[in-house]
Amino acid sequence: HPLRADTIMIGFSERSSPAAIDNLTRLVFANTAITNIIIVVMPKENTAIHLDMIFTQVDRELCVVYPPHFVGPERLTILHWKKGQSQVREMPNVFAALQSLGLPMEPVFCGGDRRNLQEREQWASGCNFVAMRPGLVLSYARNDATLREMEKMGFRIVSSTGFLTGEARIADDERAVITFEGGELVRGGGGPRCMTC
């Protein structure tokens, strides 16, 4: 996830290795303007094999997260690797790591405040958004609790049909979520952002 011109966030899952992360960071530092890499040590769960299944930035200072992995006693290990330093530094949480880099980020909880809805909607790619621009994202229509949380943060929910037919216009500076049906895609295990690659 590119967060800023000098900062990216990556997930370290069971599909990667310490050597792969080491090689990736060295290549990134040597060949790009990136100076900070935030590493999220992913859980060994089928529903969280990619970072965008538990974290997606949806606006400059706003991200959708699966709360158990980022807030409270079950939160994941977060590491910060700064260019020029030989070792990574463990951070208290992802928000402290980002704040230390001048990137304050406010979370939107996937599934809202109820754990059962968080689990259900995370499984259905509730954290997985495609950012078209800061504040304009695409999402499945099925994750009602997450979409309600987005509305609380000032996002207007617009159906893809309404958007494509011109019934719903979105201003250049407006926060909006364009939703689309994707029941079969969810059953196949893919989220909207996953399918953009």
Show which residues each predicted segment covers.
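The feature marks the mature, well-folded catalytic cores of soluble enzymes
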Residues: 1-197
